[in-house]
Amino acid sequence: FLSAIKSQNKKIAFLKIISGSIVLASGMSAWGGNQFFVIPIGLFILGLPFVRKDYNFLLWCIPLFVGTFLLISGLFERPGPAFVFGLGGLVLVTPTIFLILCIFLNKITHGKNFVRNGLVFLLSIIVIGSFVIIANGIPSESNFVYLPSFRYVNALFPILTSTDPLVDSVAEHASPTTDISFLFHSVWMIFAGIGIWLLLSKKISQNKIFLNNDSRLFVIIIGITGVYVSSVFIRLEVFASISLIILASLA
C-alpha cells in the first residue's frame, strides 16, 4: 500500500494496491490480531490530505484500496461481513470519506486556509464519531455498528477490565509489565530512540534518511499505535516489536 501511493506509474500503483489489499485481507483471515493494522492505516488516510498535494491520484487509489480490502475481507469467513459492516469497516470508510470531502473542500476554497478548515472538519468528525460509537455501545435493538468481542475493544481502550474469569485466566491475555517489555525490546529501544531523534530533528536534512512527508507520518502513526495497543495483552507485544523495528531501521 505504501509502495503503491509512492509509485509514479499509475498502472504499477494499481497492481500494488490490489495486491496489497489481497495480502492484508488474507493475513487478517489467518489471525484476528492483524486487525490492528486497520488503526494506523485509517489514521494515515486521515493525514494524507495534509501531506500530499496530488489529490487526483488520492481520489482513486485510496477508495480502490479500501473498497477492495473490505470486499475481500467480507468474502472470507473470518473476519467476514461483521468486520466490514462493523467497527473495522468504519475505521477505514470514515477516513476515506473525510479524504474525499477534504479534497473537494480544497477545490471549493481554492486552497485558502486549507489546513485550518481541514483540522476543524476533522475535529467535528471525531466528536460526532465518538458520540455515535458511545451511543451504539448501549445494548439496544437499534445498534447499527457491529462491535467486536471484548478483547478487541480492550485493545482500543486498555482501561477496560474483563469480568469473565475465563478471559483473565488465559496466560497470553496477561498485561505486560515493564520488566517484560525491557526484556523483549531492550536493544530495539536504543535504536528506535535514535530513529525518533533523526525523524524529528530539524538539524538533520530529511533527505539523508530518505523519508518524505507521508512516510514520516506513517512511521510516527505506527510507532505510537503499536506501543499503545501492546500495553493491553502480552501477546500484542508483537506490534510493539514491529513499531520499534520500523523506528530502529531509521538509525
Where are these regions (language model features)?
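Short hydrophobic alpha-helices at membrane interfaces in multi-pass membrane enzymes
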Residues: 5-25, 55-71, 217-221
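Transmembrane helix irregularities
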Residues: 22-34, 75-76, 228-232
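Hydrophobic/aromatic-rich transmembrane helices and adjacent perimembrane loops
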Residues: 220, 225, 230-251
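Hydrophobic core segments of alpha-helical transmembrane domains in multi-pass membrane transport
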Residues: 24, 45, 70, 124-132, ...
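Alpha-helical transmembrane segments at the extracellular/periplasmic loop-to-helix junctions
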Residues: 88-103, 120-204, 215-216
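Transmembrane-embedded, aromatic-rich helix segments that form part
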Residues: 34-47, 63-65, 81-97, 240
